[in-house]
């Protein structure tokens, strides 16, 4: 894996303590978690018969107070001044990734030459303007567009080019479920097919894509190669029940299992 720092907002509650315990177990720095007067956003999945029956959300989406935002951004800028190779902004529309915070993160990262990779949410993509990568799925693209698209190569390419032009985003990586992923950048369009397999649970597949993409870019891979690796990692994750973190060895095994044509 890579050295990872988590930054965001939490409450002073059980779910925050539980989160910090998990971070400690996985050797992830939690110093960027800013305590607030709101609950820690928590998603509880109810599983029955190996299927998700429902999900309970514990959250507040009210605007954050300026004092908390200032602490959060000060931390991000401090870390950028030290040594950060990539930033992932994962927007869940819970209040953290507002236009103020997201714009400030992109500007600060670019001042240090650090790429920003966005996992979008909602219809306001103005706040993502200027990002280096964005990784929407078809549903997220359709939440943005007035005229929804189908999951075809032609329509995905058209939507990706629109996103690049309108929001000045350099690279668009569209995750397309059974159709794999499509990477679009200036002068390049790449379709990377998924690998045939049995799918147990798609929970966390998109998170896997953006995490492995960021790790690859931070490690010096070209966009096309990082996207290929991210797609391969997602193919491992969807074979597992529940959210799952793919290991280095599992990724190596998946690479060894590729045919010469796929490689």
Map each language-model feature to its residues.
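A structural signal for isolated positions on well-ordered beta-strands in alpha/beta enzyme cores
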Residues: 5-8, 32, 86-88, 117, ...
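Conserved post-catalytic alpha-helical subdomain immediately downstream of the catalytic base
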Residues: 170, 195-258
């Amino acid at each position: 894996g890579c050295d990872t720092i988590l930054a965001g907002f939490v409450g002073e509650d059980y779910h925050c303590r539980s989160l910090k315990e998990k971070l400690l177990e996985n050797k992830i720095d939690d110093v960027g978690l800013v305590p607030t007067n709101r609950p820690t956003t928590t998603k509880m999945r109810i599983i029955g018969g190996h299927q998700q029956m429902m999900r309970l959300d514990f959250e507040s989406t009210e605007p954050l107070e300026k004092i908390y935002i200032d602490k959060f951004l000060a931390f991000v800028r401090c870390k950028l001044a030290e040594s950060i190779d990539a930033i992932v902004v994962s927007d869940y529309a819970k209040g953290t990734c507002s236009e103020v915070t997201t714009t400030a993160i992109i500007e600060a990262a670019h001042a240090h030459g650090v790429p920003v990779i966005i996992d979008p949410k909602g219809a306001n993509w103005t706040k993502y303007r200027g990002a280096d990568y964005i990784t929407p799925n078809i549903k997220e693209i359709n939440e943005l567009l007035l005229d929804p698209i189908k999951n075809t190569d032609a329509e995905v390419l058209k939507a990706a080019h629109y996103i690049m032009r309108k929001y000045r985003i350099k690279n668009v990586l569209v995750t397309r479920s059974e159709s794999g992923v499509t990477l679009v950048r200036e002068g390049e369009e790449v379709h990377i097919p998924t690998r045939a397999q049995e799918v147990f649970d798609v929970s966390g597949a998109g998170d896997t894509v953006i995490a492995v993409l960021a790790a690859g870019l931070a490690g010096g891979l070209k966009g096309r190669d990082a996207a290929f690796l991210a797609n391969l990692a997602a193919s491992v994750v969807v074979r597992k029940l529940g959210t799952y973190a793919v290991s280095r060895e599992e990724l190596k095994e998946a690479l060894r299992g590729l045919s010469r044509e796929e490689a």
